[in-house]
Regions:
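Compositionally biased terminal segments of proteins
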Residues: 1-105
Length: 105
């Protein structure tokens, strides 16, 4: 399993709501991609729970920082993460093991 996908699963396990975008989304859709990091979109209404999940994974992210910057890079114990605070894009559920991740189309 690619490390960005493992990071997405851990965020999901910690209660975060998000949509995977970028090369990790392409890989999850079965396209040939080798993501180096995880890119996600988080809706402003879900930002608090997302920040809590990131902090549980060793990331240094605060809610005021995310709301002020609207896109941030965070290093976590599971790898690098780029977060974009915005409305959710169109997505589809993609099953990875026992979990379903929301993945941009």
């Amino acid at each position: 399993m690619q490390r960005p996908v493992a990071l997405a699963l851990e965020l999901h396990r910690h209660g975060a709501s998000f949509v995977v975008v970028g090369s990790a989304a392409a890989a999850l859709r079965g396209e040939p991609a080798r993501p180096a990091d995880l890119d996600v979109v988080v809706h402003p209404d879900d930002a608090g729970d997302f920040v809590s999940a990131v902090r549980a994974l060793g990331g240094d992210l605060g809610l005021p920082q995310l709301r002020r910057c609207r896109d941030v890079h965070v290093d976590t114990a599971w790898g690098p993460l780029d977060v974009f605070l915005a409305a959710y894009p169109v997505d589809v559920p993609v099953r990875v093991g026992e979990r379903a991740l929301r993945v941009a189309t």
